[in-house]
């Protein structure tokens, strides 16, 4: 009898445990990550939903960020100098970490964030596929982006477009990207809006269609860019485009005989667009084009005797047309117009891509002398520099009542100047402020060659 009672008690205990376990597992969800974010888009409004799993209880929190229109109607902020904003140290980190081989980096900001865009070579630093990446145009090049100040790696970067020439900007609602790829005699620009292909532009001169390598400029929901097609050492064709929600709504070919525009750096100012470009044909000063939202334009060259291109002659007497001395070849650069004055960014060296400085010429937009009142060191002449370009921070991002001017500098390393199998670069950036600043040198700082080069 005792044995029968004991057996029944054990069976009852087993049944009790089984029922209890079934009730518990029935109330539990399947295993989930602790935090899961889902971003949806509803009527151009970002809805960021974050699920937080605490003690098997789910709480749903929503943070809604309404889109805005980046007006671009404000004037540039008054500034007295440039404060350092970012430095990614990509080459230094890439000697050991997984960092993309890149060139042509640039920065662009929305009303929420700033991102670094760059053209990869489909390869990582210190890897065999980095060999031969001195080449500008290949089918492996892609436009990608990452948060500003971070080294561009496969783990923090977002694919944007297949491209060996590119531009990007944000209108307050979505990112517009422009990526050019294809053969030299028939390349096509692919326009994407919010990551979706919305339009294309075919090469119209069949001679290396190319664009800014820096941000496009947005005003009142429209974004504007400049493209070039034709010889790099002679008269070419130049068009300005108005783009709305990723679609070209208007374009105008510039009537610009004896002008040469490449790799324009564009920015909005009081509702209009100003672009300062590269003359690769015959000018050691920089050409400019300014236009309104209807693409009614004016053209000229920066008149200052402080020359902005590279190579260039020593400073002297400028011209409001192309300065032909040392005018062939060139480098992407930028300037900011303030009335008759101009902030000029340029390499320190007159004949190599090294050093960088910012110079304020109070009458340099229209005057031909070489007098200046401010010079701020950015990179020492003993360190490599490279391309440079403008980007702005809108009032919707900064909370200011003006458009903040900023710039980035590419710090090129490797071929053709150094004994490596690769060419890549890191970048630094600065923004204009009306408070204390300091001149110094912020070089790339990587020790070459790498293991792959030995």
Curated annotation (Swiss-Prot):
Substrate binds at residues 103, 137, 262-263, 278, 353. One of its GO terms (biological process) is carbohydrate metabolic process. The chain crosses the membrane at residues 1-13. Its EC number is 3.2.1.18. Disulfide bonds join 77-402, 109-114, 169-216, 218-223, 264-277, 266-275, 303-320, 406-431. InterPro entries: Glyco_hydro_34, Sialidase_Influenza_A/B, Sialidase_sf. The keyword Disulfide bond applies. Pfam families: Neur. Keywords: Calcium, Disulfide bond, Glycoprotein, Glycosidase, Host cell membrane, Host membrane, Hydrolase, Membrane, Metal-binding, Signal-anchor, Transmembrane, Transmembrane helix, Virion. It is a single-pass type II membrane protein. The influenza A genome consist of 8 RNA segments. Genetic variation of hemagglutinin and/or neuraminidase genes results in the emergence of new influenza strains. The mechanism of variation can be the result of point mutations or the result of genetic reassortment between segments of two different strains. This is Neuraminidase. The gene is NA.
């Amino acid at each position: 009898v005792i044995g029968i009672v004991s057996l029944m008690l054990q069976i009852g205990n087993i049944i009790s445990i089984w029922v209890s376990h079934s009730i518990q597992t029935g109330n539990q969800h399947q295993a989930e990550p602790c935090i899961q974010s889902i971003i949806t888009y509803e009527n151009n409004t970002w809805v960021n939903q974050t699920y937080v799993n605490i003690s098997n209880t789910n709480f749903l929190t929503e943070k809604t960020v309404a889109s805005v229109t980046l007006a671009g109607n404000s004037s540039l902020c008054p500034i007295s100098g440039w404060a350092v904003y970012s430095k990614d140290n990509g080459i230094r980190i890439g000697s050991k970490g997984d960092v993309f081989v890149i060139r042509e980096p640039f920065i662009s900001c929305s009303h929420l964030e700033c991102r670094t865009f760059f053209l990869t070579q489909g390869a990582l630093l210190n890897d065999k596929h980095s060999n031969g990446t001195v080449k500008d145009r290949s089918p492996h090049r892609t436009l990608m982006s990452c948060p500003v100040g971070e080294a561009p790696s496969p783990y923090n970067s977002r694919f944007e477009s297949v491209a060996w020439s590119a531009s990007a900007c944000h209108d307050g609602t979505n990112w517009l990207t422009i990526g050019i790829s294809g053969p030299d005699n028939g390349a096509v620009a692919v326009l994407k809006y919010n990551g979706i292909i919305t339009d294309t532009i075919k090469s119209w001169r069949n001679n290396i269609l190319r664009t800014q390598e820096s941000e496009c400029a947005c005003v009142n929901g429209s974004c504007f860019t400049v493209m070039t097609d034709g010889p790099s050492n002679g008269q070419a064709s130049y068009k300005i485009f108005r783009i709305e929600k990723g679609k070209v709504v208007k374009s105008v070919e510039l009537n610009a005989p004896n002008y040469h525009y490449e790799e324009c750096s564009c920015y909005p100012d009081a509702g209009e667009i100003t672009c300062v470009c590269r003359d690769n044909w015959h000018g050691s000063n920089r050409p400019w084009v300014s236009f309104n939202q209807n693409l009614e334009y004016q053209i000229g060259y920066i008149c200052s005797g402080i020359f902005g291109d590279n190579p260039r002659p020593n400073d002297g007497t400028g011209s409001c047309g192309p300065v032909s001395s040392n005018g062939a070849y060139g480098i992407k650069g930028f300037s900011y117009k303030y009335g008759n004055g101009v902030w000029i960014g340029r390499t320190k060296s007159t004949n190599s891509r090294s050093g960088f400085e910012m110079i304020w010429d109070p009458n340099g937009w229209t005057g031909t002398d070489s007098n200046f009142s401010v010079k701020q060191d950015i990179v020492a002449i003993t360190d490599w520099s490279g391309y440079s370009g403008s980007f702005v921070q809108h009032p919707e991002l900064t909370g200011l009542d003006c458009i903040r001017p900023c710039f980035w500098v590419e710090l090129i390393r490797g071929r053709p100047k150094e004994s490596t199998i690769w060419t890549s670069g890191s970048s630094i950036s600065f923004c204009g402020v009306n408070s204390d600043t300091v001149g110094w040198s912020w070089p790339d700082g990587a020790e070459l060659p790498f293991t792959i080069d030995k």
